[in-house]
Design a protein with these regions (language model features):
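Core active-site phosphate/anionic-ligand binding loop and the adjoining beta-turn-alpha structural block
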Residues: 6-74, 80, 87, 91
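Glycine-rich phosphate/pyrophosphate-binding beta-alpha loops
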Residues: 89-122
């Protein structure tokens, strides 16, 4: 039997060495950054989200917003690379406690079938999954309201004020 999930598989430590990724091509940098952003977004609205996972996810999203464009433009900027490593670690802490969602499940299959980098597959699916999560059946109405409020909060953190919850 192959075990797909076991607590023994979780790492005890993470090494965040920005120097190891300075030679990553821009496409890899962009794809991994989108994966980090998706980890944080999904954890933020996951059923298992709590104050601690929300804080980690929010900080990760802010770091991605500020430093992903910088590392894409200037791959040797160690400070920006360190911030992206921190974003990745924070998003990992958030999703390992809150969970992930539909986006990642679909991105794994899409990426494998069509040979698309995982982060790119996440980015391709994200607008549709965000819309699906924000609008749904009456049975999910309370959870959807919480989700749209959280999406509106992220939109505000990203400087997109002035939108309604539905537009966010």
């Amino acid at each position: 039997d192959v075990c797909s999930s076991d607590l023994e598989l979780l790492p005890d430590a993470a090494v965040l060495d920005a120097g190891l990724v300075c030679s990553a091509p821009p496409g890899v940098t962009a794809a991994t950054g989108m994966d980090v952003m998706t980890h944080a977004l999904e954890a933020y609205v996951a059923a298992g989200a709590n104050d601690f996972t929300d804080a980690a996810a929010e900080k990760a999203l802010l770091l991605v917003k500020e430093y992903l464009p910088e590392v894409y433009r200037s791959p040797l900027d160690l400070y920006a690379r360190e911030r992206m490593h921190n974003a990745s670690c924070l998003a990992g802490m958030a999703f390992s406690n809150a969970g992930l969602g539909l986006n990642h499940g679909m991105a794994h299959t899409l990426g494998q079938h069509f040979h698309i980098p995982h982060g790119t597959a996440n980015a391709m699916l994200l607008p549709w999954v965000l819309a699906f999560n924000a609008f749904g059946s009456k049975a999910r109405e309370k959870r959807i309201n919480q989700t749209t409020e959280k999406y509106a909060r992220i939109a505000a953190l990203y400087g997109m004020d002035g939108f309604s919850k539905e537009e966010s």
